[in-house]
Amino acid sequence: MRIVFMGTSHFAIPSLKALIASEHEIAGVVSQPDKQRGRGRKVTPTPVKEIAEQYKLELLQTANIKTPESIKRIKQWKPELIIVVSYGQIIPLSILEYPRHGCINVHASLLPRYRGAAPVQRALMDGIKSSGITIMFMDEGLDTGDIIMQEAIAVDDNINHGELEKILADMGADLLLQVVDRLVQGEKLPRVVQDDSQASYAARISKEDEIINWSEPAYAIHNRIRALNPQPGAYSYINGTKVKIFASKVRSEAGSGVIAEVIEVDKNTFQVQTGEGILEVLEIQKAGKKRMPTSEFLKGFTLHPGVLLGSKEG
């Protein structure tokens, strides 16, 4: 099978590597342009570009896949199938309809739930108990195409975004190869129309999403923290110092302190009163410093019960 692969983020890497290791031919790879990242604003290639260059695959990077030049380049590769995994742009109909087997997509949710750019993070914020992978035919909509195959997994209450995304990325690669192999064998793939009445949208994570609101229930804050671990991190302020919290634990007791108040501190951790219940902070990062267990943080940061979190002024 002659394939063009379109992807950008780390989530796409297992699928691309699985195709490289298979007997299928990768005619070309399409990815987003390099971007400035990190505190030093260093120009960094996309993860998919790095793999494409490592295996000496033909590569197209474009900020706009809809330009005549981009479309022409893809058609010159003469793909029989286009595979899209975490690419990041809406693909025009002129590309979607070009390959004789169409375009298929690996999506990190059980569609039609969590259509959009941040399905894993939004699902974790919602405290979902199960998630999964959908392989689908692509159309012009946002994750609205017919479903070929789905597989679900249980989601632990403490798993974070990075951990769950890796599991789903590996699962997606396995399911993708199954689908491509079925195509090669001449099998007609199923097409299950999505029920739009059951759809939900997973919008990109915003700056506002990163802010911890201590008036929320402890479980909701815990879900936000794990949804934003490892990036970008959920944050608050302690005595005017910005801190990101990467791991937490919901305590069983309700608590009777003031919302956002530190109600207990020991050498290993500290506990905060929320709008409903108590949250224990397990891993934290002071601005400009490395992530560390709360026990290490408290060795160099004085914190007493009664301090209120959330104020920039301290």
From Swiss-Prot:
It comes from the Bacteria. It is an enzyme of class 2 (transferase). The keyword Transferase applies. Its EC number is 2.1.2.9. Coiled coil: none annotated. (6S)-5,6,7,8-tetrahydrofolate binds at residues 109-112. SUPFAM superfamilies: FMT C-terminal domain-like (SSF50486), Formyltransferase (SSF53328). GO terms for cellular component: cytosol. GO terms for molecular function: methionyl-tRNA formyltransferase activity. It catalyses: L-methionyl-tRNA(fMet) + (6R)-10-formyltetrahydrofolate = N-formyl-L-methionyl-tRNA(fMet) + (6S)-5,6,7,8-tetrahydrofolate + H(+). InterPro entries: Fmt, Formyl_trans_C, Formyl_transf_N, Formyl_transf_N_sf, Formyl_transferase-like_C_sf, GART_AS, Met-tRNA-FMT_C, Met-tRNA-FMT_N. Keywords: Protein biosynthesis, Transferase. CDD domains: FMT_core_Met-tRNA-FMT_N, Met_tRNA_FMT_C. The keyword Lipoprotein does not apply. Attaches a formyl group to the free amino group of methionyl-tRNA(fMet). The formyl group appears to play a dual role in the initiator identity of N-formylmethionyl-tRNA by promoting its recognition by IF2 and preventing the misappropriation of this tRNA by the elongation apparatus. Belongs to the Fmt family. HAMAP family: Formyl_trans (MF_00182). This is Methionyl-tRNA formyltransferase. The gene is fmt.
